[in-house]
């Protein structure tokens, strides 16, 4: 069989935070598949990168007092402990801000623009949302509102997470700025569009998405996006729409060729990052990227989550095809990972699964690799991490079944036969000298084809079940052969039987290790050392250990999961636990919690949302600001607040806050104050200065009561 050449990627994580367990699940799934391919002798380039561009990163960097480049670099510097810790074998990790990505993204754009059959890029003057308070055009992800297709609330400005619709931000119903909460205003701006609605794109994608590349459930969903269809609310959704691929300065990204002040929208250059990371790798090796991609036998695969199917099954293949490039051979879509019977992850409640915490507790990364493999399949179904099931599977399957096989047989070979393998012919002779052929070694070796195909099809759960079925058979054969009885004898015939049984068992263990190696790579290295063999590949399935082959002394290969480790893994942060609260003597915020009150006491305080319509300094006072508040009463309230040291009047106008609405009016030197605005501060103002006015999340309106 000729060697295959594969180019494999995972989705690019956005460079605004650490990896979460969902990232690690995807990387483990892809890594297992890649390791399997390498064990088949195939040449694989497995690459990843940080998705480094976009206004959210620009805004986060500004808040952190860093340049976007430094912000992204700091995030990237924290990737290695995760990848090394869980044995993820990427050949390269790059960034979409790399020179290679700038070069490739611009060239792909030019090729689309200059397509010989007619340009697939056009410009349109559009009305774009602008935040007058922040004085900037709003990125799609910083505009929220009602989906124009399915009318789901609080959807982002570029696509709906409920129905999957893609639209312009201006299509949102009742939009608001996620940065300030204000209603944005419209300003005209020239934008660049990729003409996905072009008949050429539609024809190509209708064929490409339905030719067997995609999982059936994914292909069926994608098929819906090509047609005019009725939504549940009676509205209609059209077919493929043109895709806005530009953003206005200020923006952290790649500037569009021949268009000063215009930048590629992050979703255009992000998938190009797959190619850029590969190019970076090949350039460093001294290999030609163009020659590599031009190889007609090259296979290209992307592992992604089901939340980004639209971009990878429509925009990405169309961009590649009409820019004259190879399209993916397949898009492998997986579901989400939930925790403990579908409970939503929450660190504060102790229902999150922090990958670094998992490692810091000394938990074996291959426990998690095996557990996820045992649950993953070729469909895009969600899977659940259940703590009890995790402990049971690892302790029963890996330790009780798999590792147990080696520990039972190795000791006899070392003590009685100088660690030498005997004749492993395939039958397990029982104490009466009769063959016990329930699971011949040749049969275990013959399972390689079935297990190999399951790996190839990403049916990891089925592969693990088949492997554990073999392990069960080996353990049953061992028990039926009763070698411990033979070990008590000094008769040559009995000892020969003992050596043969132990040799068969070790050979079975070797084969199981081979089959599990894509999932348990570190353990496989230990076993290879113990058995004194070369690195295992699938071609070794029929190459049994020869008679007289020496093995090493057996050392324990894997510990069981301790329930205390799982308890610690899901333990809420220490400051949230009653025990920690009892130990801590430092008063929160510099002052003790006030004496307890009843719910009736609290109900006497009427807290309302109020909009700050106007704010001005108070002449004669260095502490007070005069606030004009709209509390939904049909009139304005005048409230004085001692926040002048922390806020400029202009910064508060238009914001919403919390008002004590039923506080008795207070006559002051400067006028009457009709309530109180809530603000937070530390009791020790010298060491912890600052006053922080309370501001509700977007969506709250004047007059709403706080309960």
From Swiss-Prot:
PROSITE patterns: AA_TRNA_LIGASE_I, TRBD. Its EC number is 6.1.1.10. GO terms for molecular function: ATP binding; metal ion binding; methionine-tRNA ligase activity; tRNA binding. GO terms for cellular component: cytosol. It catalyses: tRNA(Met) + L-methionine + ATP = L-methionyl-tRNA(Met) + AMP + diphosphate. Zn(2+) binds at residues 147, 150, 160, 163. GO terms for biological process: methionyl-tRNA aminoacylation. The keyword Aminoacyl-tRNA synthetase applies. ATP binds at residue 347. Keywords: Aminoacyl-tRNA synthetase, ATP-binding, Cytoplasm, Ligase, Metal-binding, Nucleotide-binding, Protein biosynthesis, RNA-binding, tRNA-binding, Zinc. It is found in: Cytoplasm. Binds 1 zinc ion per subunit. A motif ('HIGH' region) lies at residues 13-23. Residues 601-707 form the tRNA-binding domain. Its main location: cytoplasm. Is required not only for elongation of protein synthesis but also for the initiation of all mRNA translation through initiator tRNA(fMet) aminoacylation. PANTHER family: METHIONINE--TRNA LIGASE, METHIONINE--TRNA LIGASE, CYTOPLASMIC. Belongs to the class-I aminoacyl-tRNA synthetase family. MetG type 1 subfamily. This is Methionine--tRNA ligase. The gene is metG.
